[in-house]
UniProtKB/Swiss-Prot annotation:
PROSITE patterns: RNA_POL_N_8KD. Its EC number is 2.7.7.6. Part of the RNA polymerase complex. It catalyses: RNA(n) + a ribonucleoside 5'-triphosphate = RNA(n+1) + diphosphate. Disulfide bonds: none annotated. Binds 1 zinc ion. DNA-dependent RNA polymerase (RNAP) catalyzes the transcription of DNA into RNA using the four ribonucleoside triphosphates as substrates. It is an enzyme of class 2 (transferase). GO terms for cellular component: cytoplasm; DNA-directed RNA polymerase complex. Its main location: cytoplasm. It is found in: Cytoplasm. This is DNA-directed RNA polymerase subunit Rpo10.
């Protein structure tokens, strides 16, 4: 749904990295490897990395039904 603000496991703020991660790693051109993007953003913990990699942004799909 919405981007999580904090990691569910350790509580580190991860929401601030979503826009940069999305712009660099999730383009259809396949510009950069997601692991390299997360390294550049300083997201080191595995639990925090999975929060960004596994997130599906569905807020635009769900919002008409509210």
């Amino acid at each position: 749904m919405m981007v999580p603000v904090r990691c569910f496991s350790c509580g580190t703020v991860v929401g601030e990295h979503w826009e940069a991660f999305k712009a660099r790693a999730e383009t259809h051109d396949g510009d950069e490897d997601p692991a390299d993007v997360l390294d550049d953003l300083g997201v080191d913990r595995h639990c925090c990395r999975r929060m960004l990699i596994a997130h599906q942004d569905l807020v635009d799909v769900v919002s008409p039904y509210q």
